[in-house]
C-alpha cells in the first residue's frame, strides 16, 4: 500500500470517528492519544533504521468522557470528565508487539488533580489495567492538572499534564509521506477503537522518575483514537 493509499484509509477511519459517536456498549468511553520516540506512521526503511535505537519511550493518555469503574468494596466510581496519563520507558523499541516487546518497563502515572481520593485510586487502577505490562512497574504517581482534548472532525489533539507532559498532534497529510510506503506500521500501545496515525507537533516529557526526559517535535509518531472498555 502506498503512502497516498494509506492516507485514504486514514480518511475513511476519520469519517468513522466523526459519524459514530461513543456507543453505550462499554462501561468507560472516551478519547485516547499516544506518542512514541520512534515513527509509527512509516515504512520498513525508517522502522528498520530505528529498531533498537529509538522508540523506547512513550506517552499514553486517556480522557474518560463518560462512565464509571467497579472498584470492589468502594463500588462504582464515576470517572466522567477525568483524565490520566502514563509515561513509560522500556529496555527495547516498542515495536510490533508494543509493550510486550521489551524485557523491562518502568512507568510514571499522572492523575487528574480534580479527582477526589476514590477517583484518583480508580484512575491509577484504570491506567494500570489498560496499559498492560506498562502498568506493572509504577515508580511514581503524581496528581497534576490535565487538559486533554481531541477534535474528531479535524483530528487535532492536545494533552497538557502539569509541567511534565505536553503532546500536540495532527492527522498525517500527503506531504508527510517520504518513501510512499507509509502505513500504521506499529499498532497502538493500548486497545482502542478507530485509531488514526498522526504527526506529533510537540511531544515532550519533562518529569521525574524515569531517569530520562525527551522531546520529539515534528515526528510521525502519534495515534489518536476513541476507547470503549
Regions found by a protein language model. Give the residues of each.
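Bacterial N-terminal signal peptides that target proteins for export
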Residues: 1-10
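Bacterial N-terminal signal peptides
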Residues: 9-19
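Processing junctions and N-termini across compartments
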Residues: 19, 32, 39, 171-173
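N-terminal Sec/ER secretory leader and immediately downstream segment
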Residues: 26-109
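Mature extracellular/secreted ectodomains of secretory-pathway proteins
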Residues: 73-196
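Extended, charged low-complexity segments
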Residues: 172-229
Amino acid at each position: 500500500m502506498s503512502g497516498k493509499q494509506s492516507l485514504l484509509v486514514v480518511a475513511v477511519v476519520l469519517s468513522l470517528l466523526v459519524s459514530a459517536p461513543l456507543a453505550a456498549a462499554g462501561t468507560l468511553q472516551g478519547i485516547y492519544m499516544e506518542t512514541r520516540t520512534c515513527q509509527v506512521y512509516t515504512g520498513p526503511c525508517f522502522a528498520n533504521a530505528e529498531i533498537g535505537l529509538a522508540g523506547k519511550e512513550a506517552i499514553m493518555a486517556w480522557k474518560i468522557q463518560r462512565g464509571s469503574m467497579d472498584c470492589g468494596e468502594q463500588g462504582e466510581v464515576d470517572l466522567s470528565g477525568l483524565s490520566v496519563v502514563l509515561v513509560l520507558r522500556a529496555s527495547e523499541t516498542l515495536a510490533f508487539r508494543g509493550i510486550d516487546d521489551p524485557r523491562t518497563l518502568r512507568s510514571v502515572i499522572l492523575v487528574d488533580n480534580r479527582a477526589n481520593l476514590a477517583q484518583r485510586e480508580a484512575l491509577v487502577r484504570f491506567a494500570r489495567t489498560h496499559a498492560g505490562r506498562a502498568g506493572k512497574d509504577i515508580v511514581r504517581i503524581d496528581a497534576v492538572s490535565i487538559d486533554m482534548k481531541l477534535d474528531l472532525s479535524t483530528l487535532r489533539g492536545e494533552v497538557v499534564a502539569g509541567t511534565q507532559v505536553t503532546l500536540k498532534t495532527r492527522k498525517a497529510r500527503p506531504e508527510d509521506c517520504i518513501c510512499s510506503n507509509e502505513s500504521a506500521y506499529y499498532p497502538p500501545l493500548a486497545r482502542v477503537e478507530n485509531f488514526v496515525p498522526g504527526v506529533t507537533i510537540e511531544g515532550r516529557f519533562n518529569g521525574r522518575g524515569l531517569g530520562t526526559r525527551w522531546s520529539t517535535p515534528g515526528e510521525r509518531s502519534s495515534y489518536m483514537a476513541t476507547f470503549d472498555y
